[in-house]
Amino acid sequence: MVGGGGVGGGLLENANPLIYQRSGERPVTAGEEDEQVPDSIDAREIFDLIRSINDPEHPLTLEELNVVEQVRVQVSDPESTVAVAFTPTIPHCSMATLIGLSIKVKLLRSLPQRFKMDVHITPGTHASEHAVNKQLADKERVAAALENTHLLEVVNQCLSARS
């Protein structure tokens, strides 16, 4: 581990992560611009919401670290469900819960209340995936976490635009 830090500061667990190419911006279609046409929420729209979330450890986005990918986002607008699988950069990443919480908060703040959200670790990619997934699925634990001023501040830093 080396010194440095992103949002949390301190020592880095993954001092040299792989950095991936960002996908291009999605072109806006005429149908999407027409306010008279109902515009359903799709996987790309959800990915666009979460791709720029900052990693808590590195000055990079979750997309640049390949923690989130559009192929791991599933949406059913008619059923009002969104599922996002994310992949921590290392199997013992201690930031996995914070990353999942940041994704969940971004979706909670961005989507209509009718949506049921499932944010979870991509199966087989983290040593504690079941424990982390259980925490992220527990509405009371998520609500309690967001009442913690320090934790909410860290989540907000992950969600803020980098300068």
UniProtKB/Swiss-Prot annotation:
It is found in: Nucleus; Cytoplasm, Cytoskeleton, Spindle; Midbody. GO terms for cellular component: cytoplasm; cytosol; cytosolic [4Fe-4S] assembly targeting complex; midbody; MMXD complex; nucleoplasm; nucleus; spindle. GO terms for biological process: chromosome segregation; protein maturation. Disulfide bonds: none annotated. Keywords: Chromosome partition, Cytoplasm, Cytoskeleton, Nucleus. The keyword RNA-binding does not apply. Coiled coil: none annotated. It comes from the Eukaryota. The keyword Protein biosynthesis does not apply. InterPro entries: FSCA_dom_sf (IPR034904), MIP18 (IPR039796), MIP18-like (IPR002744). PANTHER family: CYTOSOLIC IRON-SULFUR ASSEMBLY COMPONENT 2B (PTHR12377:SF0), CYTOSOLIC IRON-SULFUR ASSEMBLY COMPONENT 2B-RELATED (PTHR12377). Component of the CIA complex. Component of the MMXD complex, which includes CIAO1, ERCC2, CIAO2B, MMS19 and SLC25A5. Interacts with CIAO1, ERCC2 and MMS19; the interactions are direct. Interacts with KIF4A; the interaction facilitates the transfer of Fe-S clusters to KIF4A to ensure proper localization of KIF4A to the mitotic machinery. Interacts with CCDC117; the interaction is direct. Component of the cytosolic iron-sulfur protein assembly (CIA) complex, a multiprotein complex that mediates the incorporation of iron-sulfur cluster into extramitochondrial Fe/S proteins. As a CIA complex component and in collaboration with CIAO1 and MMS19, binds to and facilitates the assembly of most cytosolic-nuclear Fe/S proteins. As part of the mitotic spindle-associated MMXD complex it plays a role in chromosome segregation, probably by facilitating iron-sulfur cluster assembly into ERCC2/XPD. Belongs to the MIP18 family. This is Cytosolic iron-sulfur assembly component 2B. The lineage of its organism: Eukaryota, Metazoa, Chordata, Craniata, Vertebrata.
